[in-house]
Amino acid sequence: MYLLLFAGVAAYALILMKQRPPLALYEARTKQADYLPLSAVPARQTELLVELEDSDFYTHSGVNLFEIRSAVQRNLGAKKIVYGGSTITMQLAKNLYFRFTHNYLRKAAEILIALALERKLGKERILDFYINIIYFGNGVYGFSDAVRFYFGKPVSALTLNQMFLLACIPPIPTRGNPIQYPEVFERIRNRRLNYIRRKKEPLISQAEAAEIFAHDSSCLDPELRKPDDFTRNYPQTIPFINERFGRFACSDGAPLHHYFGTKTSNRSV
């Protein structure tokens, strides 16, 4: 029975990749106007994203078995799927091929696709692809758009505090968003900063950490976008759009039109 189940999941994963070849998806993304090559992202920003999301990214083959086992044990204890144990490669697979359904069969297919992505794309292109489609809350996908949305400045002008702030958003982009929920985000930021400081070779020095800690929830960063009608109203439409069309509805450049009420700000992203 389990063998047949595995064969079915494997066949499903193969069909998805045949319909939407990973390399073709990657090349299509590089041709879009908001594409940001990995080489244009500050090296420290990349290091922070990798360290906080998947510290073993450069050594695993797409799947971290220890994290998967830990997630399964915690989910069994919670009696529902709460923890994913996902690597960066698995998150890329989820963003490219799956809707927001949470079940073990989808996770199994996600694992198989992640293993295939490692072979077909390699680490550099996976990371390049990842930073261009990762969700940063408020309907913002991709690092380039996130920098413009949250700080209104070019990537090259980011401060260390802003880099760290952006690196902390992806794990909880909605419920821990720094604009709508600054107090929640502050707790997330502090936990992650302490995690990095405990490393044998921390990416952030004690002096730099003290500077980041100086920003509390009342001012996470002086340049951070303030709450407005757009950030208050627009996120309410995201669950509807994702449920109706899926996360990858526009991944090939197809237009998706959505109309807002007159009270919604017309400030552009």
In which residue ranges do the predicted regions lie?
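Juxtamembrane regions of bacterial inner-membrane/periplasmic proteins
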Residues: 1-269
